[in-house]
Amino acid sequence: MNNQIWMMTSAFKSLELGKIVEKAKEADVQGLELCVFSNEGSRKDHVATHLDYENFTSDCAKRLLEWFGSEGLRFSVGSYENLIGGNTADRELNQNHLLKLIRIAYLCGGDENDVKVGTFVGYNDELGIQDGGFEKNLYEYRRIFAPIVKYAEDLGVTIIYENCPMEGWRSRTWSFTYNNLPATLAARKLMYALIPSKAHGETYDPSHDVWQHINPSDVVRATDHSRLHRVHVKATRNLRNQSSIYWGAIYPKQYVNEELAQRAGVPVPQHDWDRYPYEAMLPGFGGYDSMDWREFLETLMEIGFDHPFVIENEATNSAHTGNQGATMQGFKTAVWCLAPILWTLKENEGYTFCDNRPKLKISERKDIPVVTMKELLA
């Protein structure tokens, strides 16, 4: 294969970008997915902001491209929020922020430099609880995203959706946990049918399907391969614990009055993300997870996937410890778990990435004004 392996910068919330570049070189990766969340957003978990999105100019783009090119690194940008649901103010802020990231990607060369924009879609629960709520969310998605995708297409930029259901985005008292429209393959195919443009695609994270007892290799085979631009590397270990015995592993653990639960001897969720019996891991770090990574990678080889693998470190025993040493150990282990399948075995060097990538094109694009959803929908 010879795919690039990248790191996602969400694990380094407190570090400046220069320090993260040093970490990337230390881990022997070839690129970074730069998290560029809004500083005004309501989401607080797994967020980071590693570019000045409010003051990003064509000169900033040129300096960033020259810097990363000199370091042998590539990059994309991403922010993962609810763009079709939640309260109106947050929704509008998130939509406008995504438009800022599309502009940044354009200034950095967009598809010419493989600078994609990672995002969620989110979910509108007010529509979702109605009869036909899923289909209503599809049409709300089309209403909001059709002009966004057209804007990206006109600028030569591709938007890519990640498939996390965001099961912890609602209170633990909420009965269902589907909070991000592209969480299933069926939803993604329906989305592309509604907006046929090639200016949007997906980042596939197999860990979310693993805890739903779906084989990610089957999903990859059924995916429109032209839409698959990134793979997030994150692992899941399905747990056989008291929670799975009492609640099963398909439906979310439900919350009831804790005094009643204690009398009945029934476990209830302790926080919003405590809904399913699994543990977040990284491949090869701290034991086995519940996916056959070799089968998964070989399936991607079969379909000719030649895009980056991006390590997203949310592992309980790595980034979630808050220990920078453990965080880097997790990243490095994941790299070397993937390397024997992805990279070439060189004499006396071991498994090595063969860097035959074209150089980053230093963009000479002129600044364009920031646009808003109100302007796109006018």
Where are these regions (language model features)?
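Histidine-acidic metal/acid-base catalytic patches
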Residues: 1-9, 13-28, 69, 88, ...
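Structural motif corresponding to the early beta-alpha repeats
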Residues: 3, 29-30, 34-143, 147-158, ...
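Residue-level recognition of beta-strand->loop/alpha-helix junctions
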Residues: 9-11, 35-36, 79, 163
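Asparagine-centered polar/low-complexity signal
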Residues: 82-83, 163-165, 199, 208
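Active-site-proximal beta-alpha loop/turn segments in soluble metabolic enzymes
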Residues: 121-134, 160-179, 319-320
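Eukaryote-skewed repeat-based solenoidal scaffolds used as protein-protein interaction platforms
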Residues: 138-139, 149, 168, 187-189
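Conserved Rossmann-fold SDR core element
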Residues: 158-160, 203
